A protein has these predicted regions:
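Short, hydrophobic/aromatic-rich segments at coil-to-beta transitions
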Residues: 57-62, 86-91, 151-161
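Short, solvent-exposed helix-to-loop capping segments enriched in aromatics
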Residues: 124-136
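Secretory pathway targeting signatures of secreted, lumenal, and periplasmic proteins
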Residues: 69-127, 161, 167-169
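Short, well-structured beta-strand
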Residues: 35, 146-226
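Hydrophobic membrane-insertion alpha-helices, especially the h-region
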Residues: 25-53
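N-terminal intrinsically disordered, acidic low-complexity segments at the extreme N-terminus
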Residues: 1-22
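A short, amphipathic edge element
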Residues: 135-143
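Ser/Thr/Pro/Gly-rich low-complexity linker/stalk segments immediately outside membranes or between
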Residues: 21-26, 50-71
Length: 226
């Protein structure tokens, strides 16, 4: 007895194929249907490749070319570079609603130290830095601290807040040392401040709050984006 040939095509319980259904219902030739499906599949595949390979909008790059050398990206629709104040290397600000954000870079000068700076000296220096911030911000509360990496820099980060009925301040300060001292040519203090009078961020303020954190995290030593 010969074996039955295997069934080719859709099983009966699944109904007719798409080309057969379109031909029976609307008179569309099967070759036309298959051609349209192939084009749609190709467009979808290209869209997936673009999504996976294209980076998100990077923002505007700003470079500090003299030591310490660094650059970062910021969203020009929400933030803008302003003149640095005394003791600062760079200042970027944004305003939306009642929210004000600031990203500030300052030079970091440490005493001579023979050991591992990031493990030995920075935590001690960070404690003193936190004490200084506590004197400036009433209601200062240190919410977290520890070693941190920001792209090609490693250091120690302090995260804190000062919440009062009339004013809220959320801050981050990271003391950064470049992986390659010849690239960064110096150490920095990278700071983020988000300040508004009372209440949590509104829906209109949330994009600035989010994008300012991304800009803070975009910091890199050197002039390239890696």
């Amino acid at each position: 007895m010969s074996e039955a040939a295997p069934r080719v095509g859709p099983r009966p319980e699944f109904g007719p194929s798409l080309p057969a259904w379109l031909r029976a219902r609307f008179g569309v030739p099967p070759l036309v249907t298959l051609g349209v499906v192939a084009v749609v599949a190709l467009v979808a595949a290209v869209a997936i490749v673009i999504t996976l390979s294209s980076p998100s909008a990077p923002g505007k790059q700003v470079v500090h070319p003299s030591p310490p050398v660094f650059n970062l990206l910021y969203p020009p629709a929400l933030m803008h570079r302003v003149a640095a104040r005394p003791g600062e290397l760079m200042r970027i600000e944004g305003h939306r609603g009642k929210l004000t954000t600031e990203i500030v870079v300052r030079p970091l000068k440490l005493p001579a130290y023979k050991g591992d700076v990031t493990h030995g000296l920075l935590p001690v220096y960070a404690d003193r830095f936190a004490d200084a911030q506590a004197k400036l911000l009433p209601g200062f509360l240190l919410t977290s601290e520890g070693r941190a990496r920001v792209n090609n820099g490693v250091g120690y980060e302090l995260v804190f807040q000062s919440v009062r009925p009339a004013r809220r301040v959320y801050g981050r300060d990271v003391l950064l040392v470049p992986d390659d001292i010849t690239e960064g040519k110096g150490l920095v203090i990278l700071s983020l401040r988000q300040t508004k009078p009372g209440g949590p961020f509104t829906k209109a303020e949330q994009p600035l709050a989010y994008q300012s954190k991304k800009a803070y995290r975009s910091f890199r030593f050197g002039t390239s984006r890696g």
